Amino acid sequence: MTEPKDIVLKESEEVEGIPIEGPWLDDVSSLEEVLDYYERIGFQATHLGKAIEIWKKVEKRRAEGKEVRVFLGYTSNIISSGLRELVAWLVKEGKIDVIVTTAGGIEEDFIKALKPFILGDWHVNDALMREKGINRIGNIFVPNDRYIEFEKYMIPFFERVLEIEKERGKPLTASEFIYELGRYMDEKLGKEKERSVIYWAYKRNVPIFCPAITDGSIGDMLYFFKEERGDRELIIDIANDIVKLNNLAVTAKETASIILGGSLPKHAIINANLFRGGTDYAIYITTAVPWDGSLSGAPPSEGVSWGKIRAKADYVEIWADATLVFPLLVWKVMKAP
């Protein structure tokens, strides 16, 4: 019979690898030095460290003249939050080549160029908020006058789109619609537009795809526009955008896919990469879980089984709120000496 002590204190094999270690604060004097430890801390900190390593590799290859086409996908809450400015900066600096987002990721970017969203609280009387005309996104408040102001700009914009479509004899695709919205911002708005993703995508000719362009306030405004005018002519074409998006993946020598959240943007990007045998680099930041079978929670390894991520790809998934980790990731890759 095996002795209890022998069961508990079973002999082990030696494990080779990186020792787990965190920063000793007497030895570090900057955030950069703290982040250098992340890969050795363990848990999700290690995953963030891996993401830094992957994105730096992509940046190095691009700096060497190698073509790595960077796709960025994000859900609307990224733009609701203060991550909007980080995304806009990345586009301005030429770090992103293709964007896929939801309708909220478009309209909220425009609205913030008109009036800011306000820091609120998670725990409020939501029925009272409704009475006051204040919408809530987590702990971010969006007074309804933002959408009223948005409508003042969008109705004339729809009229412009309708004229463009009549002149060219065919509908704008969603990405062309968003490009024209960027041009419209450039013409109509002041300095506040310079923190806008749409504006910088227009200036840098970065396509923004939004396959569900009507699923939000833009759709509400289109409904009002069409119903009040009996319009049957204004059409947004999403079919030709799928060709354009897929070809941006197919024609790339290498691709990197950075996904904040899940949902439609995530799948649109990795599915486009299926047509080239999978993306070469992938960074997922999500709080979604895999055990319900959702696309949002599917880890990169599941994407490998579909051919959407290459078997030999360099990839990592960080289970965390993007507002916590994305600023650290961007700063470490783009700004740390």
From Swiss-Prot:
Lineage of the organism: Archaea, Methanobacteriati, Methanobacteriota, Thermococci, Thermococcales
GO cellular component: cytoplasm
Species annotation: Thermococcus kodakarensis (strain ATCC BAA-918 / JCM 12380 / KOD1)
Identification of the protein by name: Probable deoxyhypusine synthase
InterPro entries: Deoxyhypus_synthase_arc, Deoxyhypusine_synthase, Deoxyhypusine_synthase_sf, DHS-like_NAD/FAD-binding_dom
Family: Belongs to the deoxyhypusine synthase family.
Swiss-Prot/TrEMBL GO biological process terms: spermidine metabolic process
Cofactor (UniProt): NAD(+)
Function: Catalyzes the NAD-dependent oxidative cleavage of spermidine and the subsequent transfer of the butylamine moiety of spermidine to the epsilon-amino group of a specific lysine residue of the eIF-5A precursor protein to form the intermediate deoxyhypusine residue.
GO MF entry, a single one: deoxyhypusine synthase activity
Keyword Flavoprotein: no
Broadest EC class assigned to this enzyme: transferase
This protein's UniProt keywords: Hypusine biosynthesis, NAD, Transferase
Pfam families reported for this sequence: DS (PF01916)
Catalytic reaction list: [eIF5A protein]-L-lysine + spermidine = [eIF5A protein]-deoxyhypusine + propane-1,3-diamine
UniProt-annotated catalytic positions: K308
EC number(s) recorded for this UniProt protein: 2.5.1.46
Keyword Lipoprotein: no
